[in-house]
């Protein structure tokens, strides 16, 4: 990114500065393509996954489920496909969308039914994702979900799939997304993609999964009525979504923040909305349970000491809640 910050050239220009900027963009495109199992020509850089979903789904007639991200739900019939108590979609053919992994529960959709679009944002970098093996015509990924900069993402799209340009202008990104490319952001995206690919090859997330599972076991030992959402399904290795009786999610967020831990009640994209998780309600949980849920996310460098510290803070705070309830 530092090299990109020093360049003043437009990647569409033919002079030396422009060619240097273009080379950075194309190098990043190759790294992103390698991470997601796509051809470089199938990677279209955007301002993020929200824009990528709009480009892919605008003017389409698609079926999906209520556990999809809001940026996807805006363009689909989200009542068409039901999910079970683990958040797994019922198989369905036709023009469908699929969230590869849920941002709140981490539940992975293992079937290959999506014919139109896949939201791969949460999955990429944490579990293997291969666009070439997907049935979908398009998919979305985002840089900040793999440790890259915010405000840059990519649309993965088959060369055979026609889509109408939604950002009109100079025809950049092979005519699929106009506007001068964010060279600095794209450079960071490429570097993050290369690092994420190495982490997957080195299986660094295996230790994260073990720590996550150990944390959940300790939480259940402390509170046997604690619910871990999606624990019977395949999940991302870094995500834990759980609810404890009598302790609302937003209160937990505040208590953990005071203790030095950044957790969330629902998806971070919906932070500030103090209401029950739409995803958990779609999975069949009641309003009170869904309102008591928090999500704890871990990184590939999370340590046992981090988990011990979190468990100490959480159990101490919940002990006070139980004391007030007389439990």
Give residue spans per PLM region.
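Pyridoxal 5′-phosphate
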Residues: 1-327
